[in-house]
From Swiss-Prot:
The keyword Glycosyltransferase does not apply. Pfam families: DUF92. The lineage of its organism: Eukaryota, Metazoa, Chordata, Craniata, Vertebrata. This is Transmembrane protein 19. The chain crosses the membrane at residues 30-50, 64-84, 99-119, 233-253, 272-292, 328-348. Keywords: Membrane, Transmembrane, Transmembrane helix. It is found in: Membrane. Disulfide bonds: none annotated. It comes from the Eukaryota. It comes from Rattus norvegicus (Rat). The keyword Oxidoreductase does not apply. The gene is Tmem19.
Length: 351
């Protein structure tokens, strides 16, 4: 005759077999990470197989190492997910960052470290003294929360240059040497200039409103303007832009020392640091000039904050409503990326 277990026995069995919510979440997270890692490995192997097939078919193409594929995919996923988790990127920004990060990493590790330096420092500075910035900026977002448009305007030019670099030179690191590889060296400096320009502008925008003791001056007329005015510059902002670009150039230079083998028979690489600083400063100046002339700035008399959209309640300060902030960033990045490497090629030291 079968006996029915008592309620106490059933409860004990249930408590032994049933996991609490926190344990379940840990197991689910662990399984999810395993699945994601497995997918990443499969994707990396698939890319490697395609590169090997293309190399065999065309003959002139150099196959990419499977470890390079794996590193490029893993790092891009980790950084994008981390940026989204910390609110530096929104959903679309994380997807855009994934594409930009992957292309720059697979092309050249020096590109990757420069991008990483720009992203990490800019994200930290955006969050720095956020409460104070919220009182000064009408469009302030916690953590930055950059979308795909902002990612494209800051990373679109470097991404296109990285693709052209791979077509010209193939994936891999190389010394900057205009005498031996003029076109590829120009592309590398152009990409560095674009990233350093964006970093310089971001550093100036995030540091100057907090640390500057004096009112900004409009770059076109040198008149004093309220904090947050497009085209307003300060000494603190200009120094910050120089430092921002220098940090990006330093990241590129250090990566060259680690991954490039024939530096002893190539042109000196130390000018990369000065080049990055100059690109950051020039990018900030060009951005300020475009902002002062082609971007509307007005004072909202109801809030006392500077706004970028003309309304009946705003008092015009400077500029015309032709471009928005994203377009200004894109145009300044393009101009610096085109002009500065051409000028640098004439002064770059030789062996």
């Amino acid at each position: 005759m079968l006996s029915i277990p008592s309620p106490q026995v059933l409860l004990a069995l249930f408590s032994m077999t049933d996991l609490d919510d926190s344990t379940c979440k840990k197991y689910i997270k662990m399984i999810t990470n395993i699945v994601i890692l497995s997918l990443i490995i499969c994707i990396s192997l698939a890319f490697w197989i395609m590169s090997m097939t293309a190399s065999t078919y065309y003959g002139s193409l150099r196959p990419v190492s499977p470890w390079r594929w794996l590193f490029s995919v893993v790092v891009s996923v980790v950084i994008s997910c981390n940026g989204f988790k910390k609110k530096s990127l929104d959903h679309s920004g994380a997807l855009g960052g994934l594409v930009v990060g992957f292309i720059l990493t697979i092309a050249n590790f020096s590109f990757f470290t420069s991008l990483l330096m720009f992203f990490l420092t800019s994200s930290k500075l955006t969050k720095w003294r956020g409460e104070m910035k919220k009182r000064l900026d009408s469009e302030y977002k916690e953590g930055g929360q950059r979308n795909w448009v902002q990612v494209f305007c800051n990373g679109g030019v470097p991404t296109e240059l990285a693709l052209l670099y791979m077509i010209e030179n193939g994936p891999g690191e190389m010394p900057i040497d205009f005498a031996k590889q003029h076109t590829a060296s120009w592309m590398c400096l152009s990409l560095l200039a674009a990233l350093a320009s964006s970093a310089g502008d971001t550093w100036a925008s995030e540091v100057a409103p907090v640390l500057s003791k004096s009112s900004p001056r409009l770059i076109t007329t040198w008149e004093k303007v309220p904090v947050g005015t497009n085209g307003g510059v300060t000494a603190v902002g200009l120094v910050s832009s120089l430092l921002g670009g220098t940090f990006v150039g330093l990241a590129y230079f250090l990566t060259q020392l680690v991954f490039v083998n024939d530096l002893d028979i190539s042109a000196p690489q130390w000018p990369l640091i000065a080049f990055g600083g100059l690109a950051g400063l020039l990018g900030s100046i060009v951005d300020s000039f475009l902002g002062a002339t082609m971007q509307f700035s007005g004072l909202d008399e109801s809030t006392g904050l500077v706004v970028s959209s003309p309304t009946q309640e705003t008092k015009h300060i400077s500029g015309k409503p032709i471009l928005d902030n994203n377009a200004v960033n894109l145009f300044s990045s393009v101009l610096v990326a085109l002009l500065l490497p051409t000028a640098a090629s004439g002064f770059w030291p030789t062996v």
